[in-house]
Amino acid sequence: MPVPPLTSHRQTYSRALRPKPESLRVFICDDDLDFAAELASALATCGFEARTLLDGRTPIEIFELFAPDVILLDLFMPPPDGFEMMNHIVQNVAHRHLSLVIMSGGDAGMLQTADHFCAARGIVASAVLQKPIHLGDVLQVCNAHGRRKNDGME
């Protein structure tokens, strides 16, 4: 399913971001819009509802409106960066149910630092992936989250 275009009507746009009740929602929080769009398209083909960053909304606004089950979070973006987004997730207990996938083109040491950053704040990353990522790794996290959700474990 293509990502709805940004319209001049804020209310229409907000409705488009609201999740469908039965589908697993994946937010691709990455400033590489081509990469994010390609990944969103692949996830949609697999039956997931995926959203990316769109002009006119901050990552936090999209995150709050879309209420994702899984967030694929790039560490290095213009503010708010991945670390600020992780802090936002930690501060909001309602978001503790989600599966967090940390992604970066940085080296393995940076990814390990991000994983420790999460753990120190009481959240566990479901996966830590170095770019270029593989769709199979993302699908594994999404499917595991879907199973937990269907089993009522969250």
Give a label for each model feature.
Residues 67-69, 93-101, 124:
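His-Asp phosphorelay/catalytic-motif detector in bacterial-type signaling
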Residues 74:
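Active-site residues of response regulator receiver
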Residues 1-27, 124, 134-154:
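Non-catalytic signal-transmission and effector/linker regions of two-component phosphorelay proteins
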Residues 20-34, 39-43:
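Conserved acidic segment of CheY-like receiver
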Residues 55-58, 81-87:
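Acidic catalytic/metal-coordinating carboxylates
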Residues 52-70:
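Acidic, metal-coordinating helix/loop segments flanking the phosphotransfer/catalytic sites
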Residues 36, 78-79:
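The feature encodes the CheY-like receiver
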Residues 84, 97, 106-128, 140:
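Alpha4 helix (beta4-alpha4-beta5 surface) of REC/receiver domains from two-component response regulators
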